[in-house]
Amino acid sequence: ASDVYKRQLSPSSILMSSGHTTVSNMFYNMASHRVGLVGNWDCVAFDEVGGITNTSGDMIQIMKNYMANGSFARGSDSISSDASIAFEGNTFRSVADMLRTTNLFEPFPEGFNNDSAFFDRIHAYLPGWETPKLRASLFTNKYGLISDCFSEFCHAMRKYDFTNSFGEYF
């Protein structure tokens, strides 16, 4: 189901199914002077966060800076981007056990899990156990919104800033 990002919902997203990438691939390759995935996609999604293998200090630090500011520095270059980063994964315990614990981010690799500043920069946590599983009764035989139309709408709306739109509600 997590391949929805790339194959079914949005051609503007990429799914890193292996969980492995490098700083050069993700952000900026200093040898070729080319911006990485965050400069070329609306959303870079990591499938199975527990499988993320690059937990180097550089990767975590650059990712934290990017998540906080929408920019990162590589060498003497400072690059801005507005790509979202999504982390997907399964829990290793039952829902009841997860609800009793205070660390819902346990599936992340140790390099991330020991960095509270990384988790401070996460904007949303969607507990998958609260999302209904897809089944025939959820589909309609009436008119509906085709996913590529919705995807294009979301892609076009990225140029608008709604950051302050929610202030009156919080």
Describe the residue ranges of each PLM region.
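Short, small-residue-biased leader/transition segments that mark boundaries at the very start
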Residues: A1-Y5
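AAA+/P-loop NTPase substrate/partner-engagement loops
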Residues: Q8-A45, G51-S56
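Conserved nucleotide-binding/hydrolysis micro-motifs of P-loop NTPases
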Residues: G50-I52, I85-V95, F105, W129-L134
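A short helix-turn-beta junction within AAA+ P-loop NTPase domains corresponding to the substrate/partner-engaging
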Residues: L99-P132
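Conserved AAA+ ATPase small/helical "lid" subdomain
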Residues: H123-F170
